[in-house]
């Protein structure tokens, strides 16, 4: 019985290793992972939550909320159309830290962009 158990365990381990070689990790990536990799260090105006703007003083939560709700955008400069004059000056200060990619439903579903459930 012990030999049978060790044989079955060995077969399962070998099968798992073989599957790891046949199906690389990239096959398991989802749309959200891909989108996060595309934008790198920049904040994606079409796919980021309001919380992503906390790193830019003066933008969180008011300006960030307007940008998130006002999308989608085709370019970074389009986002300034939803802001007033004083908010535009703050936005322009950090403009180089933003990017725009196609909007993905997996990232934008529901109200996750407004409140993504991250609390201290």
From Swiss-Prot:
Residues 1-29 form the signal peptide. Its main location: membrane. The gene is psbU. It holds the Pfam family PsbU. Coiled coil: none annotated. One of the extrinsic, lumenal subunits of photosystem II (PSII). PSII is a light-driven water plastoquinone oxidoreductase, using light energy to abstract electrons from H(2)O, generating a proton gradient subsequently used for ATP formation. The extrinsic proteins stabilize the structure of photosystem II oxygen-evolving complex (OEC), the ion environment of oxygen evolution and protect the OEC against heat-induced inactivation. The lineage of its organism: Bacteria, Bacillati, Cyanobacteriota, Cyanophyceae, Synechococcales. This is Photosystem II extrinsic protein U. Belongs to the PsbU family. GO terms for biological process: photosynthesis; photosystem II stabilization.
